[in-house]
Regions:
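C-terminal ends and interior cores of transmembrane alpha-helices
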Residues: 1-9, 206-219
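Hydrophobic core of transmembrane alpha-helices in multi-pass small-molecule transporters
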Residues: 12-27, 224-238
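Pair of pore-lining "gating" transmembrane helices in MFS-fold secondary transporters
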Residues: 20, 130-151, 230
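Intracellular juxtamembrane helix-capping segments at the cytosolic ends
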Residues: 27-41, 238-251
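Glycine-rich segments within core transmembrane alpha-helices of 12-TM secondary carriers
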Residues: 48-67, 266-274
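C-terminal membrane-cytosol helix-exit motif in multi-pass small-molecule transporters
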Residues: 67-68, 72, 90-115, 304-308
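Juxtamembrane intracellular "pre-TM" segments in multi-pass secondary transporters
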Residues: 105-140
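Helix-to-loop junctions at the C-terminal end of transmembrane segments
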Residues: 183-196, 282
Length: 315
């Protein structure tokens, strides 16, 4: 409502404040992946996370294709056409709230707190790597987010600057977004089967390959840039699913929600830093250098996840 009012009144301050509040919905949407894992056994936890992640793809694809029809709806109501999507999203948020209040009972997080701690009564997933802890999980997702946002943000600008149309740039981004979420069921199976650490390393390698491909792609090659962005999305997916599973495994149930919230704040800040700094980097040293720098950052995930947390013993 605030965004629509800001658009109608041509009030930038109101619009910005409303958009900040609107962002809370996106944060809740991302947090939903943790809720999917609250009651999952360790052996199926990553698959539970991935199921929620792939559901967000449906909304993303549908929303991206509603711009024109919702614009017609807004115009019919005497509102600016671009407010149409916010009319629909407001209704969708309200419906989601009703679903949560009516059907999410009992709250899976509260129910999980009444169950025995992980490792006592519940089976441990093969390859769960208990040496990994919360800091590693946060670092995996943080570096993944920084690399993905930085390269993704500047790729359309790079394409437009070299003569490609908005249609080509839009197609590349659409393929990228699809690769971010559609592989989630497969990612969940891989994480549960081969372990959090292995797929986190796979995320780093995939992101690095994507970065090298983006840096070396000829300026007139939409196909290679699209392939680079697809791999970038896939690497992000691997990192997000494995990092989420690492954190959920390591955090005690009593403090898990706080830990998960802290992780997502770090991810959001990292994404903002990656997005804002990417433009300055491209202006200073170019898009290929930005991509290669992103690849180096991604490879920092490997030593982070291969380093086990030191165990302390008491005599």
């Amino acid at each position: 409502a605030g965004i629509i009012a800001g658009a109608v009144l041509d009030n930038t301050v109101l619009t910005v404040v409303a958009l900040i509040l609107y962002g809370a919905g996106a944060a809740a949407n991302l947090q939903a992946r943790y809720a999917g894992a609250d009651l999952a056994t360790p052996a199926r936890r990553a698959r539970a996370v991935s199921t929620v992640l792939v559901a967000t793809t449906l909304g993303g694809v549908a929303g991206a294709n509603l711009t024109a029809p919702t614009g017609v709806l807004a115009a019919a109501l005497g509102l600016p056409p671009l407010t149409g999507l916010f009319l629909v999203s407001g209704a969708a948020y309200a419906l989601a709230a009703v679903v949560l209040v009516v059907w999410l009972r009992p709250d899976p997080f509260l129910l999980a707190r009444t169950l025995p701690p992980d490792g006592q009564a519940r089976p441990v997933a093969a390859g769960s790597e208990h040496g990994l802890g919360v800091p590693q999980g946060i670092l995996v997702m943080l570096l993944t987010q920084i690399v993905m946002i930085a390269i993704m943000t500047m790729t359309p600008i790079h394409m437009l600057g070299h003569g490609h149309g908005t249609g080509a740039a839009g197609l590349v981004i659409a393929l990228h977004v699809g690769a971010m979420f559609l592989p989630s069921p497969l990612s969940g199976i891989l994480v549960d089967r081969y372990g959090r650490r292995a797929i986190a390393v796979a995320a780093a390698v995939t992101l690095a390959v994507a970065a090298v491909l983006a840096a070396s792609a000829p300026e007139d090659s939409v196909v290679l840039l699209a392939l680079a962005l697809i791999l970038l999305g896939l690497g992000w997916n691997f990192g997000m699913v494995s990092g989420t599973a690492i954190i959920t495994d390591a955090a005690p149930v009593a403090t898990r929600a706080k830990t998960q919230g802290t992780a997502d704040v770090a991810i959001a800040i990292g994404g903002a830093v990656g997005g804002m700094s990417s433009g300055f980097i491209v202006v200073g040293i170019g898009y290929p250098a930005l991509a290669l720098l992103g690849g180096l950052i991604a490879l920092a995930i490997v030593p982070a996840v291969l380093r086990r947390v030191a165990r302390t013993t008491t005599s």
